[in-house]
Amino acid sequence: MDKLIITGGNRLDGEIRISGAKNSALPILAATLLADTPVTVCNLPHLHDITTMIELFGRMGVQPIIDEKLNVEVDASSIKTLVAPYELVKTMRASILVLGPMLARFGEAEVALPGGCAIGSRPVDLHIRGLEAMGAQIEVEGGYIKAKAPAGGLRGGHFFFDTVSVTGTENLMMAAALANGRTVLQNAAREPEVVDLANCLNAMGANVQGAGSDTIVIEGVKRLGGARYDVLPDRIETGTYLVAAAATGGRVKLKDTDPTILEAVLQKLEEAGAHISTGSNWIELDMKGNRPKAVNVRTAPYPAFPTDMQAQFISMNAVAEGTGAVIETVFENRFMHVYEMNRMGAQILVEGNTAIVTGVPKLKGAPVMATDLRASASLVIAGLVAEGDTLIDRIYHIDRGYECIEEKLQLLGAKIRRVPG
């Protein structure tokens, strides 16, 4: 397994471009299964999860065409099997997103129960109950979700989400696009990635209204056609590099991003002492060489502070002036990185769903192990602000969510390199 070696102590300084959002790209790729003519998806990040989704299509008989810019053209009319097998689904939770489109377009689907990050119990029952509300017959047996649409196809329905679910909202929105009649999703996720999927569906000929609010109304249509669509920028990658710059007292300019979908994070960085300026597609952060001030953070669904940025802020707080509390309300079991950071000299106390971080002037490099995607990003930031060398093991977690992380950090002046396992 590859490892990252980071020699800390350098302030980040420079410009990089932000990749397309994985959490937008995966549902949009799944949505291409709904169309009866080819769909081209652009601005895809070069990530393992994207490769896995493309491989999953290949297993199903759909052979995407990939150009030199990694734009992917999908023609789902060649589909041969409606099974998403366990050996692929187990590596990536987002495979569940093919369930709604396959069921709506082809009338049946068989999808293995998903794997993915080891954070908390992320149930798929909302997906199942929502599709049942649209008339689907679903059984879970042998580790597979086996779904059949009624004769004549899925029917529009009303569904209320007991808890806000991003992938649940996306799956039902895609299924409803080809259902008969109107579907109303209440307590729907409001994330920018949900809005991006709705925009893509509408570009394909769907009628989706209200995405970005907690009530989404979908009028089913008879068919969806081809489109060319650009995936939105990755707000979590953007936030991660901003926090890395803030923690090191540096200055960065991030291009091809969108400041309007990151307001909660930018506000907290300003509170930490960062000078931030923005344009329509760029963000600049300058700490002017200063140490950050500790901030309090409480995660919640969008538009509040994102759970996927919590670990990075713990790293910044670890070397900040003062004490900051980070409260995690979205997932349980999401402080696994804290114990690794304490081995580097951080002073972090976990009490239930709260991490209390007392800043220290410097962390010390140490061998550490990544446990999930965002936790691994926090260890990279910790390595950047530590004295000496930090060796991060199990970086396949990082590669699931960050495109060329060591190359981008090198462009910003970090001493970081990948060593083959």
Swiss-Prot record:
Sites of 2-(S-cysteinyl)pyruvic acid O-phosphothioketal modification: C117
Give the GO biological process terms: cell division; cell wall organization; peptidoglycan biosynthetic process; regulation of cell shape; UDP-N-acetylgalactosamine biosynthetic process
Q: Which reaction does it catalyse?
A: phosphoenolpyruvate + UDP-N-acetyl-alpha-D-glucosamine = UDP-N-acetyl-3-O-(1-carboxyvinyl)-alpha-D-glucosamine + phosphate
Question: In which compartments does the protein localize?
Answer: Cytoplasm
- The EC designation for this entry is 2.5.1.7
Keywords in alphabetical order: Cell cycle, Cell division, Cell shape, Cell wall biogenesis/degradation, Cytoplasm, Peptidoglycan synthesis, Pyruvate, Transferase
Q: Where does UDP-N-acetyl-alpha-D-glucosamine bind?
A: R93, R122, P123, V124, D125, L126, S165, V166, T167, D308, V330
Residue positions of the active site: C117 (proton donor)
Its pathway, per UniProt, is: Cell wall biogenesis; peptidoglycan biosynthesis
The record's annotation in InterPro entries points to:
Enolpyruvate_Tfrase_dom, Enolpyruvate_Tfrase_sf, MurA_subfamily, RNA3'P_cycl/enolpyr_Trfase_a/b, UDP_GlcNAc_COvinyl_MurA
Q: Which domain of life is it from?
A: Bacteria
A single MF term (Gene Ontology): UDP-N-acetylglucosamine 1-carboxyvinyltransferase activity
Q: Please classify the protein's predominant subcellular localization into one broad category.
A: cytoplasm
Instruction: Look up the record and report any one GO term of the cellular component aspect.
Output: cytoplasm
Q: Which residues bind phosphoenolpyruvate?
A: K22, N23
User: What's this protein's function?
Assistant: Cell wall formation. Adds enolpyruvyl to UDP-N-acetylglucosamine.
Give the matching NCBIfam families.
murA (TIGR01072), PRK09369.1 (NF006873)
Q: What protein family is recorded?
A: Belongs to the EPSP synthase family. MurA subfamily.
Q: Name it.
A: UDP-N-acetylglucosamine 1-carboxyvinyltransferase
| Species of the source | Pseudomonas aeruginosa (strain ATCC 15692 / DSM 22644 / CIP 104116 / JCM 14847 / LMG 12228 / 1C / PRS 101 / PAO1)
